[in-house]
A protein has these predicted regions:
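Catalytic core of non-heme Fe(II) oxygenases with the double-stranded beta-helix
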Residues: 65-178
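Non-heme Fe(II)/2-oxoglutarate
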Residues: 1-92
């Protein structure tokens, strides 16, 4: 059984709106250098510019950028994922709102890693990644599963955060990735 599952947003316009939100945040200097576990900036490990949705205050309401529609679909994906693993009546709490990560061509999360513990100190059971644009030769590679998720606009992948799902970014030398 594969413990990663892929889903697709029904409205791909959500992706465009979230990219617009990121760009607006970047213009207001609300983005920051991507961090790795422990909150360290280590560009030799991960090179990106990141933005937490919860910091969107100066940009208007997140719903202005279809974040509410994204959150609704994401919650449905998570429910479906948990049911597929026959994990019922479990309460999982999202500790923080999602972040948008931007990678220039050649940038990415270069090293194998797991996401069980975040830089904010929260313990994670599951990870989700939603690709906001198509990235040929981009995506996420899973070490033990010998499996690569393609970065397709609107695709969400959910997987366990622990050691069983060590992964890294597939670096595109030609394309940006959100």
């Amino acid at each position: 059984m594969r413990f990663s599952k892929e889903y697709t947003l029904s409205d791909l316009g959500i992706c465009d709106s979230l990219i617009d939100l990121y760009k607006a945040a970047d213009k207001k200097d609300l983005t920051y250098a991507g961090r790795v576990g422990g909150g360290s900036v280590m560009p030799e490990v991960k090179k990106s510019r990141d933005f937490f949705i919860e910091d969107a205050g100066p940009l208007g309401e997140p719903s202005d950028y279809k974040f509410d529609l994204y959150q609704e679909q994401l919650n449905g994906f998570i429910d479906s994922y948990l049911q597929s693993l026959t994990i019922h009546n479990q309460e999982f709490v999202m500790q923080r709102l999602p972040q948008i990560q931007y990678y220039k061509p050649g940038d990415g999360f270069y090293t194998w890693h797991v996401d069980a513990s975040g830089s904010d100190g929260c313990d994670r059971a599951f990870v989700y990644i939603t690709y906001l644009n198509d990235v040929p030769n981009g995506g996420t590679e899973f070490f033990y599963q010998e499996y690569t998720v393609e970065a397709k606009k609107g695709k969400t992948v959910i997987f366990p955060a622990g050691l069983t799902h060590k992964h890294r970014g597939v670096i595109s030398e030609e394309h940006e990735k959100y």
